[in-house]
Amino acid sequence: FNITGIPRLSLVSVTQIAALAALCAVISILLCMVMEFSHSRFQMYLPNTYLRIAVGGVVIIALTLLVGTRDYNGAGVDVIVAALEKGKAHPEAFALKMLFTAITINTGFKGGEIVPTFFIGATFGCTAAGFLGLDPSFGAAIGLVALFCGVVNCPVASILLSYELFGGSGLVLFAVACGVSYMLSGYYGLYSSQKIMYSKTKPEYININAK
């Protein structure tokens, strides 16, 4: 992706990026909680698989008609590209994608969580960047990587992802974002089977499953 507005490494830029990453950590916790809550509630109130899928389909169609766009159906790659390369995203896009994803996946439709996570991170970062004095395009890139790091608890993989998607320019800044998001996202994760072996805040072996 061709992103713009990568700042020089300085105390100001590090502070701005740390603030955005901290916000992304909060959003990552919220995403994990929404996914877990919706999964348990759909299983509880709609135990029949076929009925659950039917209800989910009707709800998604209704929501799509309500918002007046299909941007939140499917992977949403066009929206991700617009946020990264044009610095454009609707302020509510990240929340709507979170809602659409939770309903779609947890009512039984097949699909992954990772690309929707990219969507949520990129659109949130693009929107929040302006409040922190960052370029929206660069903010979208930071948001994508930081949110991904928060939900998968894999900082090294997230740094490598930033290099793969955006090249080596600003790699230290992406590393800062990943570090902050990882530290502040707690022990939440998209996958409850994930084992977190060590504490994020102290040198302690904990061996717990992600929440």
What are these regions (language model features)?
Residues 1-211:
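Alpha-helical transmembrane segments and immediately membrane-proximal extracytoplasmic
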